[in-house]
From Swiss-Prot:
Family affiliation: Belongs to the RecO family.
Gene3D superfamilies per UniProt: Nucleic acid-binding proteins (2.40.50.140), Recombination protein O, C-terminal domain (1.20.1440.120)
Keywords for the protein's UniProt record, in alphabetical order: DNA damage, DNA recombination, DNA repair
Stated name of the protein: DNA repair protein RecO
Taxonomic source organism: Xylella fastidiosa (strain M12)
Length: 243
């Protein structure tokens, strides 16, 4: 299959054999693709190598045969966000999450748009924690494993003042006892879940519980094996948490 002048975001790049690269990209029309960029060493290929960097938005042409395609041409369409510190680690996180959860060639049209929006939020450092929670919600919904964020697992509308455990398969389950602080630590309030459902930024105090709750859900869908970016962010923050 010939792919011509398709736009994509670069997710990951690694060496492939002696002079080539394996480039993972996210496209709107074809989903996630793995492309081999051959012979990219040398001064003449400097512009191409610069375009094939994580977070870069590119236009490319390729020939797709089997699992991996052959990259024929690529050019940068903008300047990739220049990130540092926790924002840079957040970019590693969203890319690793995509690589681990989204299979190649799966139709993910809406996720491409969500990635584009998250990339711009990272560029402007706009409500980082909230931006990541929105992206996590979008990736789960795109993969068909999201859940209703307005009702609990029994179909009862969420109480904004209550606390809920997020069951990876059934959705929010109300915490029966509000007095156990250890249990409440890993729960999300009804208020923050409703905010996530409607994409309305909540009170900052609710975001820590939502982060831990979403991590448990993601860990389930990751087969119990965590992300390297979680470890990097934990080291950066000196605590064992996900972004």
């Amino acid at each position: 299959m010939l792919i011509e002048h398709e736009v994509a975001f670069v997710l990951h790049v690694r060496p492939w054999r002696e002079t080539s690269l394996l480039v993972e990209v996210l496209t709107q029309a074809y989903g996630r693709l793995g492309l081999i960029a051959r012979g990219v060493q040398g001064l003449k290929k400097q512009t191409l190598r610069a375009a094939l960097q994580p977070l870069q938005w590119i236009r490319f042409s390729a020939i797709q045969r089997g699992e991996l395609g052959q990259l024929r041409q690529a050019e940068a369409l903008d300047t990739a966000p220049r990130l540092k510190g926790e924002t840079m680690l957040a970019s590693f996180y969203i890319n690793e999450l995509l690589l681990r959860l989204v299979p190649r060639h799966a139709p993910v049209n809406e996720l491409y748009l969500a990635y584009s929006q998250t990339r711009e939020r990272l560029r402007t450092n706009d409500s980082l924690a909230w931006s990541l929670r929105l992206f996590e919600r979008d990736i789960l919904e795109t993969l068909g494993v999201g859940f209703n964020l307005e009702c609990d697992a029994n179909g009862t509308p969420l109480d904004p003042a209550a606390h809920y455990v997020l069951d990876p398969l059934e959705g929010p389950r109300r915490l029966l006892s509000e007095h156990n602080n250890a249990e409440r630590r890993d729960t999300a309030t009804g208020h923050v879940l409703l905010a996530l459902a409607h994409k309305q930024i909540p009170n900052t105090n609710d975001l820590a519980g939502l982060r831990r709750s979403m991590r448990a859900v993601l860990l389930h869908h990751l087969g119990g094996r965590g992300l390297k970016s979680w470890e990097m962010i934990a080291a950066f923050r000196h605590q064992d948490t996900s972004p």
